[in-house]
Regions:
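Preference for long, amphipathic alpha-helical scaffolds in soluble/luminal domains
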Residues: 1-8, 15-21, 25-352
């Protein structure tokens, strides 16, 4: 399926006039830093990332880093995640940094399930209560909206507009359904939600990168593997035809961001195929995947963290998002053998 690429375009002359300043409502992003050469020894990568995590991350991301890379305790991650849990069984309190305020929101649910999946703890009474919560907040078609309307003016990212009667979206429903299926959760809520996802995935025509990511998350966990493989093959062709993925980071100027995305907010093969067993891995050649992972490794900044390509809309959200991006980068690099398969360096030692 991977095909030939177009020839590179002529670069803009350095003396060309600066393009006009975008209107105030146009998404903006911090300028991309120069990409350093990836280090040959993986330990400095982890050392720098660890320092960045201790300096900037929330308690949850600190505990997650310790669990995944320092033989930390899963209970500590669980406890940190529990501080975002609401009495209704959902998650809030800016667990996803793009949605501020205490209210339970579907994006927070997807974030919590990713954390629990990484711990191997996506089961039990907590998940039963969560599914009951999802049953009570679903749209008439059994799906989840991106953002529920809030009784107070809690801040949200401008790319997540709030509607009085929001429709169900694959963007949120896909990851939640996929992660529950991946962990063999069975609940009545999943029946209609799964049908919704199948309908959206198999009828996608014009789409955008984050919606594709959500479709991949659904296909990654859904039980019908033959149907998932067929849907993934079709989706991969669509992604390449619509140029939704930067296949060669050296030619990223040829892949403009999707409408509504910030300048530089482009996705690469590793953003879709986060693990070698992902249904999206077959969309890309070995060479395309190698270039993508080289680019990811080289994107580590001088402070040890990875950049965020989304629109910078609030200082707190941007600060909280970078450690999350750093953890995702490290986990992806390790999944592809770019870091040690299991890091067992000693974790933090409490004072005597």
């Amino acid at each position: 399926m991977p095909g030939d690429e177009a020839s590179p375009q002529s670069p803009r002359s350095p003396r060309s006039p600066r393009p006009p300043r975008p209107p105030a409502h146009t998404p903006t992003a911090l300028p991309a830093p120069p990409a350093p050469r990836p280090p040959s020894d993986p330990l400095p990568v982890l050392d720098r990332a660890e320092r960045f995590i201790w300096l900037t991350a929330r308690v949850l991301e600190q505990r997650r880093f310790a669990f995944h890379f320092l033989d930390g305790d899963a209970d500590a991650v669980d406890t940190a995640l529990g501080s975002y849990l609401n009495p209704d069984g959902g998650y809030g309190h800016a667990l996803d940094p793009d949605l501020r305020g205490p209210l339970s929101q579907p994006l927070h649910t997807a974030h919590a399930l990713r954390v629990l999946d990484g711990l191997g703890r996506c089961a039990g009474q907590r998940i039963e209560r969560l599914c009951r919560h999802l049953t009570g907040v679903s749209t008439p078609d059994g799906a989840l909206p991106v953002v529920f309307p809030a009784p107070h003016d809690y801040p949200t990212a401008p790319y997540h507009p709030m509607h009085d009667d929001p429709p169900g979206e694959l963007l949120t429903t896909g990851p939640v359904v996929g992660l529950l299926h991946r962990n063999r959760v069975w609940h009545a809520w999943l029946f209609r939600a799964t049908d919704f996802c199948w309908d959206r995935v198999e009828n996608l025509h014009r789409t955008h990168p984050y919606e594709v990511q959500s479709a991949v998350a659904f296909l990654d966990g859904v039980p019908d593997r033959a149907r998932a493989a067929a849907a993934a093959d079709r989706l991969g062709r669509l992604v390449r035809e619509q140029r939704l993925v930067v296949l060669d980071p050296r030619r990223r100027a040829e892949y403009p961001p999707a409408p509504g995305y910030a300048p530089g907010e482009q996705l690469f093969p590793h953003d879709f195929a986060r693990r070698p067993e992902s249904p999206a891995r077959g969309w890309f050649t070995d060479e395309e995947m190698r270039r993508s992972l080289d680019f990811l490794a080289a994107a580590q900044q001088a402070d040890g963290g990875w950049p965020v390509r989304r629109e910078a809309w609030a200082p707190g959200s941007s600060l909280e998002r970078r450690p999350i991006a750093t953890l995702e980068a490290l986990l992806t690099l390790r999944a592809y053998g770019r870091l040690p398969a299991r890091v067992s360096r000693p974790g933090p030692v409490p004072p005597r």
